[in-house]
Swiss-Prot record:
Presence of keyword Ribonucleoprotein: no
GO cellular component, one term: cytosol
GO biological process: 'de novo' pyrimidine nucleobase biosynthetic process; 'de novo' UMP biosynthetic process; amino acid metabolic process
Phylogenetic classification of the source organism: Bacteria, Pseudomonadati, Pseudomonadota, Betaproteobacteria, Burkholderiales
Keyword Kinase among UniProt keywords: no
Catalytic activity: carbamoyl phosphate + L-aspartate = N-carbamoyl-L-aspartate + phosphate + H(+)
Protein name: Aspartate carbamoyltransferase catalytic subunit
Amino acid sequence: MLNKRNPQLNAHGELIHLLSIEGLPKAVLTQILDTAGTFLSVNDREVKKVPLLRGKSVFNLFFENSTRTRTTFEIAAKRLSADVINLDIARSSTAKGESLLDTIANLSAMHADMFVVRHAESGAPYLIAQHVAPHVHVVNAGDGRHAHPTQGLLDMYTIRHYKKDFSNLVVAIVGDIVHSRVARSDIHALTTLGAAEVRAVGPRTLVPADLKHMGVRVCHDMSEGIRDADVIIMLRLQNERMSGALLPSAGEYFKSFGLTEEKLALARPDAIVMHPGPINRGVEIDSSVVDGRQSVILPQVTFGIAVRMAVMSTIAGNNA
């Protein structure tokens, strides 16, 4: 039986779908982060396998392009011993006009156990979760501007790995926040986990004003936004989602909001720099920072496998 207040949870408060971080209790987030820690060592084994999803079929449905997310989901499922099916959307019946729900119905008839879904339309994973059988689980791998919960969780794992505790942290999220599903997921996770201060930093055209109602400090000046920050999360400009001229030029944007070593010096000396990728060097961040000692961008990718293993194994073990 589903939880009437949150479709991601069953009546016992256990996670059965991961659709958004918003509304999830701190205990659920902490459980996933703790579980991810136990899976991290699997990456270093000679045989990188555990049998938790043996006999289960995981369908990766990516209606938008992806490198890191799709690959790490596939690796994570295979390391859990699942059978992984990657649907080629461009060559599928979807490209011939088949509806999303008809596609899901047909794949469900093939005894799918889990759908990992990335879609351009916000809410698509919610729609799928409403129409699958009780034993089938749905993981949101990014839907429109709405949410990217596994990226949010791996960002939280990265922060916890390097900073241990959220309670005294100042976290600055810099860039195209208005179009970013990662920013939304990170903000919900950070506030739930008790970060001391969350800042949204960017030009007025790219930072939603309503973030203030979520307890987020909005800064339109880069120096103010990253001063004394413990964590800086850089975001790319999502030009594919922009409908008009929101910025004068990429060069002007970099001058005002690009992270350079000079600007990074305003943050705390032990601050870490994160980025969900893909990175546009020289637009939102300088190469010297990407490759510098404070960058933890590549460890984020490594942690992503363990976090996605934790998500899939957690929801697969819970029944609706």
